[in-house]
Design a protein with these regions (language model features):
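Non-catalytic propeptide/linker segments at domain boundaries
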Residues: 1-48, 53-60, 249, 254-262, ...
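A short beta-strand element within beta-rich, extracytoplasmic domains
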Residues: 162-186
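A glycine-rich, often tryptophan-bearing local segment used as a flexible ligand/cofactor-contacting loop or short
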Residues: 758-858, 868-869, 876-877, 907, ...
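Aromatic-Pro/Gly-enriched surface loop or interdomain linker
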Residues: 82-90, 98-99, 621-751, 755-758, ...
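Active-site-adjacent mobile loop/cap segments within catalytic or ligand-binding domains
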Residues: 147, 230-233, 239-240, 251, ...
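Beta-strand-rich modules
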Residues: 591-611
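Active-site microenvironments of hydrolase-like enzyme catalytic domains
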Residues: 317-435, 467-490
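Pro/Thr/Ser/Gly-rich low-complexity, intrinsically disordered linker/stalk tracts
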Residues: 518-561, 611-631
Length: 922
C-alpha cells in the first residue's frame, strides 16, 4: 500500500486526483473557472479561539491583550473576511474546523423539532432511515451530548417529486450563513439540488451527499429579512437527482449563533470491582531440595530452577467514572470559540473531541482541528486506507501570530512551521507524498508572502525562520500542512500593519496565490491564473431611459496573469439581496433597462480563468416615475469615501500605541479584531508581561462587530433623495469615475451630492486618502461657477492632508474658501456628545463604534467665508460651527459630519428634505 512507501513523492502519484462532483457547487454561478481552484478542497483555520481553562475554571484566550487585540481575534480578521472569500472566488471548497460566520444570531430548522425557530415540512414520499442524525434536544451541550448523535434524518428517492423545505424564523434582518446537513448512504446522490430563497433572490446549489455527512455544510452568506416569510427558505428538490439514488434531509442552520457548549471540570468517582484470576506463582528451590535431587543422581545443570504453582486469586480493579454536570458557556459568538467546541457541535466523534475526559480543553482544542480535518478527508483519494467522510481535502493552512519584538522598532516579521513526520513517526502521507512536501510548502509560502508585502509596502519584510519541528497542527493532519506565524502581536511596528484592512487584503491575496500554486504543483500541472483585482471607476448614468454602467479594470503589478477577460454584473432592487449576476462578455460598458420608481444598485466582479475578484463598490440609479427623461432633473451622487485604515497612533514622549478614542480606524465592512482600548503606552514597558507590558489593553470590545466602510453611502443618499423628491432622477459614481469626467458632462446634473464620509489623509493611513483630488476640486469649482448647487458632507473636509506639501495645503484651503465657502479652524471631539444642531432641530449621529454604522468620533469646525455664507449647523446650541450654507453665486451646503451618520431615520429624512428645499429653489 501507499502507506508503506519508503520515500514518497514530491507530487501526487500519476492518476491520483479527484475528478468527481465537488462537495458543494454554486450551480447558478454564471461562469466556469478553468485555471484556478475549481473543484479543489482545502482546509484552513485561524489561530486558537476562546477555550476553557480547566485549572482556572474560566474561559480565556491563549494570548494576552496587546495593542487593542489578542492573537485569536487578530488572525481571524485576515482569514474570514479576506482569505476564505478569495479562495472561494477561485473556485475552492474551503473547510474550516471553526465557525466562520460572525452573525451571532441563529435559526435552526430540523425535522425532529419542525417548529423550533422556524418550520420544516415535506412534500412527497419521505421515510426515516436507520441511523442517527441531528437533533437539538438540549439548549446547551456537555461532554455526553453530541447533537449529530441524538436525532434522525429523512430519506427520499432521487428522481421523485419529493421536496423538503426549511423556513426559518429570522430574528433580525441581516446576512446569515446557511448550512445544510444530511446522512450518507450507499446510494446517495452526488448532485443534490438545494435552492436558497433570500430576500427576493434565488440561488441554486449542488451538494455531493456521497461525502461530508453529519456535519455543517456551508452554502454561502445571504440577506434574510426578519420573520418567517415565503422569501426566506431553503428547498431540497429530489427530482433533480438521478433515479436509483437517494437524497437525505436533516437540519438546516441559519447564522453562526452563540456558543452552546457548557464547560466545567467533571466530577470523578471510583468503583472497585473484584474479579477472580488464575495465576502461576513461582517458588524458588531451596538448598535441601537441591541436595536431595543431587543425591538421587540429578545432574547439577538439570535441576529445575523453580517450581510453578497454580492458584486462584481475587483482584480488585479501580475504575474512574467522569460525571459531567452543568457548566458555563463562553458567552461569546460561536465564531470566537476554539475548534474543540465547534467540533463538538459539528459532528466529530466524542472519542476525538476529548481524549482527556474533558480535563484539559487546551490539548483537546489543539488536536481537534487536525482530527476533524482527518475525519472529513478520510477515505478520499488523498487520505486513502482510512475510514472517514471522503471529502477530497488536499491542503491544510493555519494562520497565527506570535510574540517578540525589536527594541529598535524594526519589523519582527514571519515564521513558517512544518513537521516531516506524523503521530506514528511515518515520513510519507497515505497518498504517497513525502512529508518533506510540507517543509517546501511552508518555505515557499513564507517567501511568497514576504515578497509581496515587501514590494507593496516598500519595506523588507523579514523571514525569521523555517521551523521544522513537532507541532500538533502540522504533525497530525494527513495532508500537506503548515503554520504561518505572520507577524508579532507584541511588536508595535508589526501591529501598525496588522490593524490596516489594506494590509489584511494584500496578505490574504499573497497567501491565496501561494496556496493556488502549491495545489497546482501537487497535481503536476503548469502555471495557474490568478484572479483579478477589483475594478475601479464605476459609474451608473442615464442614456435616454436606459442606464449605462461603466468601469475600468485594475492591473496587478505583481501578477501578469491577473488581468480580467470578462466581468460579472450584479444587481439588486430596493431591499432585496444581490442576484447571482450576468456576464458582460468582456465589455466594460453595458446598457440595462430599469423600472421607473425603483431604486437599483449595481456592482461588478472582474473575471478570468483563475476566478473572480472581490466586488466593486456599488452604485445606484433611480428613475423618476413622474417625469419624462427629457424634463426630469437629475442628481449626481459621488462616493468620495473609499478610505480603509487602522486606528490612530500614539508615537511621542516615550509613549507608543493605538488610541481608539481618537480614531478607531475604518475597516472593510466590519471589524471584530479589537479586544478593547490600549491602557499601557509606556515604551519602557516593552517586553514585559501582563498589565505592566507595553500595549496592554482592555477587553470591553471583545465579541463586538464594529461597522466600517460598507461602501453604502451612495445607496443611503439615493434612498433619501428618492424618499424626499421622487420626481428627481438619481445617478451615481465613484470618485475615480467622477475624476474622469469633463466639465461639459456636468451640464446634465441639477445637483451634485458629494459623499465624503470619513475620508481623510491622516498619518496612520498606510496609503493616502485625499478628500478632494485636484480634478475633483476643478470639477466642483466649475459646477458651482455655473450657478449649480452643491451638497457636500464629511467629517474631515478641511483637515490639512498629512501627505500634502505646503503648496497643496494652500490650494486646498483656497478651494474650501472659494468653492465651499468655509474655512477649517480646528477639530471637535464627539466622545461625550453625538448631537448636532441645525435646520431648527437636534441631529443625532453615530459617534461611538458599534455594529450599525461607522462612527464619527471627530470632525472639523468649519466657519463660513464670504458675504453670502452663514453657519447652518453647530456642535451645541450656539456652539462651534459644524457646517455652512451659501446663496451666491449658487446655493450650497457643507456639513462637517457625514450625512449618512445621522442615526435617526426620521431626522435624516427631514434634514434631506430641508437641504433640497434650500438647494433647489427656483
Amino acid at each position: 500500500m501507499l502507506l508503506f512507501l519508503a520515500k514518497g513523492t514530491d507530487t501526487y502519484p500519476e492518476g491520483l486526483s479527484y475528478g468527481g462532483h465537488p462537495w458543494v457547487q454554486r450551480a447558478s454561478r454564471p461562469y466556469a473557472i478553468t485555471h484556478g481552484l475549481d473543484g479543489r478542497h482545502l482546509s484552513l483555520w485561524a489561530s486558537h479561539g476562546r477555550y476553557y481553562d480547566n485549572q482556572k475554571k474560566e474561559w480565556r484566550w491563549q494570548r494576552p491583550y496587546l495593542f487593542c487585540t489578542t492573537e485569536d481575534l487578530l488572525s481571524q480578521s485576515f482569514v474570514y473576511p479576506f482569505l476564505i472569500p478569495m479562495l472561494e472566488r477561485a473556485g475552492a471548497v474551503v473547510f474550516t474546523p471553526r465557525e466562520r460566520d460572525s452573525q451571532s444570531l441563529e435559526a435552526i430548522v430540523d425535522n425532529d423539532t419542525p417548529t423550533y425557530t422556524g418550520t420544516y415540512y415535506e412534500k412527497g414520499d419521505w421515510i426515516t432511515p436507520e441511523g442517527k442524525g441531528f437533533s437539538l434536544n438540549y439548549p446547551a451541550l456537555c461532554d455526553t451530548i453530541f447533537p449529530f448523535e441524538t436525532g434522525t434524518s429523512r430519506l427520499a428517492r432521487g428522481g421523485s417529486r419529493a421536496r423538503a423545505v426549511w423556513r426559518p424564523q429570522i430574528p433580525e434582518t441581516g446576512r446569515y450563513a446557511v448550512y445544510v446537513s444530511y446522512t450518507t448512504f450507499p446510494a446517495s446522490a452526488d448532485n443534490v439540488h438545494y435552492v436558497v430563497h433570500h430576500a427576493g433572490q434565488t440561488s441554486h446549489f449542488r451538494v455531493n451527499q456521497q461525502m461530508g455527512d453529519k456535519t455543517w455544510v456551508y452554502l454561502g452568506h445571504f440577506l434574510f429579512h426578519a420573520g418567517q416569510t415565503e422569501e426566506n427558505c431553503v428547498e431540497l428538490l429530489a427530482e433533480d437527482s438521478p433515479s436509483g439514488t437517494v437524497v437525505s434531509a436533516d437540519c438546516v442552520r441559519f447564522g453562526g449563533g452563540r456558543g452552546r457548549v457548557e464547560r466545567s471540570n467533571p466530577d470523578v468517582c471510583y468503583t472497585y470491582p473484584q474479579r477472580m484470576v488464575q495465576r502461576m506463582d513461582t517458588v524458588t528451590t531451596d538448598s535441601l531440595w537441591r541436595s536431595k535431587l543431587l543425591a538421587d543422581g540429578w545432574h547439577p545443570d538439570s535441576i529445575p530452577p523453580r517450581i510453578c504453582v497454580q492458584r486462584d486469586t481475587i483482584v480488585t480493579d479501580t475504575l474512574a467514572h467522569y460525571l459531567y454536570g452543568k457548566g458555563i458557556t463562553s458567552g461569546l459568538p460561536r465564531y470566537l470559540e476554539g475548534a474543540r467546541y465547534y467540533a463538538h457541535w459539528a459532528g466529530l466523534p466524542d472519542s476525538l473531541v476529548t481524549r482527556d475526559h474533558g480535563l484539559v480543553d487546551y490539548n483537546d482544542d489543539l488536536r481537534s482541528r487536525s482530527y476533524l480535518l482527518n475525519v472529513m478527508a478520510g477515505g478520499s483519494p488523498f487520505v486513502p486506507d482510512t475510514v472517514g467522510r471522503r471529502v477530497p481535502i488536499e491542503l491544510q493552512f493555519a494562520l497565527h501570530t506570535d510574540a517578540g519584538c525589536h527594541r529598535n522598532g524594526d519589523i519582527y516579521g514571519s515564521l513558517a512551521i512544518a513537521t516531516d513526520y506524523d503521530d506514528y513517526g511515518h515520513t510519507v502521507y497515505r497518498s504517497g507524498l513525502s512529508r518533506k512536501v510540507s517543509e517546501r510548502y511552508a518555505g515557499k509560502m513564507m517567501n511568497d508572502v514576504a515578497a509581496d508585502l515587501s514590494s507593496l509596502y516598500h519595506v523588507k519584510w523579514p523571514q525569521r525562520e523555517l521551523r521544522v519541528k513537532n507541532y500538533s497542527e502540522t504533525r497530525s493532519p494527513q495532508v500537506p500542512s503548515m503554520i504561518l506565524e505572520l507577524l508579532s502581536h507584541q511588536s508595535y511596528r508589526d501591529m501598525t500593519f496588522a490593524h490596516d484592512p489594506n494590509f489584511k487584503f494584500h496578505t490574504a491575496r499573497a497567501i491565496y496565490k501561494s496556496l493556488l500554486r502549491q495545489a497546482w504543483h501537487l497535481q503536476g500541472k503548469g502555471e495557474p491564473v490568478v484572479q483579478p483585482l477589483p475594478v475601479e471607476a464605476v459609474s451608473a448614468t442615464l442614456r435616454g431611459d436606459k442606464v449605462v454602467l461603466r468601469w475600468s479594470p485594475v492591473r496587478d503589478e505583481l501578477e501578469d496573469s491577473a488581468w480580467p477577460t470578462d466581468y460579472v454584473l450584479y444587481s439588486r432592487q430596493g431591499d432585496s439581496d444581490w442576484d447571482d449576476g450576468i456576464l458582460t462578455h468582456g465589455s466594460t460598458e453595458v446598457e440595462v433597462h430599469v423600472e421607473r420608481g425603483v431604486h437599483y444598485q449595481f456592482r461588478i466582479g472582474a473575471l478570468n480563468a483563475g476566478g473572480e475578484s472581490f466586488p466593486s463598490e456599488p452604485v445606484s440609479v433611480y428613475l423618476s416615475p413622474t417625469h419624462r427623461v427629457s424634463t426630469a432633473s437629475t442628481v449626481l451622487v459621488v462616493n468620495g469615501f473609499d478610505r480603509l485604515s487602522g486606528p490612530a497612533r500614539v508615537e511621542s514622549c516615550g509613549r507608543l500605541g493605538f488610541d481608539l478614542s481618537a480614531d478607531v480606524g475604518v475597516s472593510y465592512d466590519y471589524n471584530d479584531s479589537f479586544s478593547g482600548a490600549q491602557q499601557n503606552f509606556q515604551i519602557t514597558a516593552m517586553r514585559q508581561e501582563g498589565v505592566k507590558a507595553l500595549g496592554y489593553s482592555g477587553a470591553e470590545l471583545t465579541g463586538l462587530l464594529l461597522a466600517g466602510n460598507r461602501f453604502d453611502g451612495i445607496a443611503l443618499h439615493t434612498e433619501e433623495l428618492k424618499g424626499v423628491r421622487p420626481d428627481l432622477n438619481v445617478v451615481s459614481m465613484s470618485r475615480a469615475a467622477f475624476d474622469h469626467l469633463s466639465s461639459s458632462e456636468l451640464h446634465r446634473y441639477a445637483l451634485i451630492d458629494y459623499v465624503a464620509g470619513l475620508q481623510a489623509d491622516v498619518p496612520h493611513n498606510l496609503q493616502p486618502y485625499t478628500v478632494f483630488t485636484e480634478k475633483s476640486q476643478a470639477l466642483l469649482r466649475a459646477f458651482a461657477l455655473e450657478g449649480r448647487p452643491l451638497f457636500v458632507s464629511g467629517a474631515h473636509l478641511g483637515c490639512p492632508a498629512a501627505s500634502a506639501d505646503s503648496i497643496r495645503l494652500v490650494m486646498n484651503a483656497n478651494f474650501m474658501a472659494e468653492t465651499l465657502h468655509c474655512a477649517y479652524r480646528a477639530e471637535a471631539d464627539h466622545t461625550f456628545s453625538g448631537m448636532f444642531y441645525g435646520m431648527g432641530m437636534e441631529i443625532p449621529i453615530y459617534n461611538r463604534p458599534g455594529e450599525l454604522h461607522y462612527p464619527c468620533q471627530r470632525s472639523d469646525i468649519l466657519e463660513p467665508v464670504g458675504a453670502s455664507a452663514f453657519s447652518a449647523f453647530s456642535y451645541s446650541q450656539g456652539g462651534f460651527s459644524a457646517g455652512v450654507a451659501w446663496t451666491a453665486p449658487a446655493r450650497g451646503i457643507v456639513m462637517a459630519f457625514p450625512f449618512d451618520c445621522i442615526s435617526d431615520a426620521s431626522v435624516r429624512r427631514t434634514v434631506m428634505q430641508a437641504a433640497l428645499d434650500f438647494l433647489l429653489q427656483p
